[in-house]
Amino acid sequence: QRQMCIRDRFNVPLFSWYYEYTGDLNFLRYRAYPYIRLCGDFYEDYMQKETYGKSYRYTITTGGHEDSWDLNPPSDLAFVKQTFGLLVRYSKLLGVDQKRRKKWNDILSHLPEYKVIMPTKTPNQGLPVYAKNEAGWDLPSHAIQLHAAYPCEILNLHSDSTALQIARNTLYYYEVSQKGFTN
């Protein structure tokens, strides 16, 4: 399971990009969609549905950060969101899996938000940033939480201005102020 959480998800954007670039419906139908659906199947089984306030949410615990186990890291939430978003879109295009779309949309509608914190390390600009997990992990050695922007393309130029500004703050804090992996 750990390898599925860590490694296999990185292939989802590659399959999507190939289809989006070529428009090859045979590739989508026989290669990309089956692979993306397998990743979705994994997430459906692996994620936990829990009560949250007066509703519920789906959570994910992964070990993608050098052997730490994190609840709802933005990097993993981005891959989940990308996977189910593509499954909904591609299943409509291919005319398949209509009965599964309700579940996929439910997951998309009930994913946690990315945790936003005020940075704790200096120097910093005193601006909110995305944390590495729901607990507010603030290790500034890399900006893994921006997988939402790349490779997942969930956070993009069409995202709301607040989310984009927090992404800019995050990149500056983790990669410029704290010098990323350069120290």
Residue ranges and their predicted role:
Residues R2-I6:
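Short, small-residue-biased leader/transition segments that mark boundaries at the very start
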Residues L38-L93:
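Acidic/histidine-rich catalytic neighborhood
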Residues D70-L77, L94-D97, W137-H142, V176:
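Hydrophobic alpha-helical scaffolding
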Residues W17-T22, F27, A32-Y33, L38-K49, ...:
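Non-catalytic carbohydrate-binding regions of carbohydrate-active enzymes
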Residues R7-S16, S75-L86, S141-E153, F181-N183:
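Well-ordered alpha-helical segments within folded domains of soluble proteins
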Residues T62-E66, K115, E153-L155:
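Short, flexible loop/turn elements at secondary-structure junctions
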Residues S75-K115, P119:
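Polar, glycine-rich mid-to-C-terminal structural blocks
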Residues T59-H65, Q82-L87, Q125-Y130, Q145-H147, ...:
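Short acidic (Asp/Glu) and glycine-rich catalytic loops that position anionic groups and cofactors
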